[in-house]
């Protein structure tokens, strides 16, 4: 029986090359956020609808796979606007891939090198116990992420990493984020949290800007799923998600917004709402660094705070 091989990055030149080389020796599968646009008669391959940055979709796509091949090009994004570094996108995708491979008991992950972040990527892929091999083939990737691209939907992806304050858990970070938005003057909002939901309001307003469901997606991943509110564009296939991801064996938390389709007219979102969101998350990042500094001082560490 032929092994089942999953290709991440099967839509580009490298994917086409690999699929042609191993077509006769394996049952091929490839993932794409929009697989209907990728089907070809050149190679016998099964396309799976999957966004590599969406943890649960990657886990589902890797079901019954024997070997998984990881290659992504940071210049080819699946969102209309992507505000993130190539490094952060690569590491989030690799973390998803490594987690999914371990859950599905994939025999090995094969990585195609050629990025400045090869060592970090290989570490992420193997962080959950799956063996990782690298190919002799090296394919150089761009170090610059492309912010605006043509996309099926007017969706947004952005990432920011913050430090996990000493002695905190990921749940502490999420709860602090919710509270911080409410008491920080510069955000101009107030927040309410009840059980597994929280709401954001403009101060002195009754109708919420956004209502989120808080969901513990996996160990080390907490997702705030957008349910309703004045910032929500109605009748969209997917609603936005704000994911908090703790990188295993580190003090790094990624805050990842994806699947969000703004209600505002696109240029207004890009030039007004997006910069405000970025400024708010940056403010939270600074606050987390201060909290980490304070926690370390309390524990007796001798250190100086630097911006």
Curated annotation (Swiss-Prot):
Annotated InterPro entries: Epimerase_deHydtase (IPR001509), NAD(P)-bd_dom_sf (IPR036291)
Pfam families: Epimerase
Subunit structure: Homodimer. Interacts with GraR and GraS.
Function: Plays a role in resistance against cationic antimicrobial peptides (CAMPs). Facilitates the activation of GraS to transduce the signal to GraR.
Protein name: Auxiliary protein GraX
UniProt source species: Staphylococcus aureus (strain NCTC 8325 / PS 47)
Origin organism lineage: Bacteria, Bacillati, Bacillota, Bacilli, Bacillales
Gene name tied to this protein: graX
